[in-house]
C-alpha cells in the first residue's frame, strides 16, 4: 500500500513542478498564486497544501533537489587538476539539466529565480575555483577575471541550450563546454601580467 501512496505523491509533485515551470514562462514566482497553479495542473488546493505551505515552499524544494543532483554529480566526478577529469563531471551536470529541462529553463529564464542561479554559482565555485588556483598559482591576481569569464560563458551557453527547441544532446553540450573551457585555460596560461 505504501508504494502506491508514494507513486501518487511523486505524480502530484511532478504535476506541480511542471505546472510551475509553465507558469514561470509567463510571470515571476512572486506573481503566481496557488489557485493559478492548482487550476493549471487540475488538482485541489487542499492537495497542494498537503505537500507545501505556499509557492515558495515548492520552489525551495525544487531548487534544493536540483542542487543536490548537481552536488551528487560533482561528488561522483570531482574536479581535479587533470584536464580529462572535467569532461565526466560536465556530462553528469548536463544530464541533470536535460532531465529537468522545463523547470531549469524556467528558473534561468526571464521570470526565473536569481537565487537558483546564485546557488549554482556557489556550488561550482566551491568545487572548481580552488582547482583553478592550484593550476595557475602565478595568475592569482587575474583569477577573478578568468573565473568570471568561464562561469558566465558556461551559464550563457546553458541558457541558450535550454531555450533551443532542437537542442543538441547533453553529451554534445558537455563536450562543447569542455573544449571551450580547456581552450580558455590554455589562453589564460599564455596571458601576460599587467604592466
Region roles according to the model:
Residues 1-27:
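Basic, helix-initiating cap at the start of DNA-binding domains
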Residues 22-29, 73, 77, 100, ...:
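Basic, amphipathic alpha-helical hairpins
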Residues 23-57:
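Helix-turn-helix
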Residues 33-34, 62-71:
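Short, basic, alpha-helical segments at the C-terminal edge of helix-turn-helix-like DNA-binding modules
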Residues 75-103:
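Hydrophobic alpha-helical connector segments
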Residues 111-136, 144-148, 152-155, 182, ...:
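Amphipathic alpha-helical packing segments from all-alpha helical-bundle domains
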Residues 152, 160-195:
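C-terminal peripheral helix-coil segments that are non-catalytic and often amphipathic
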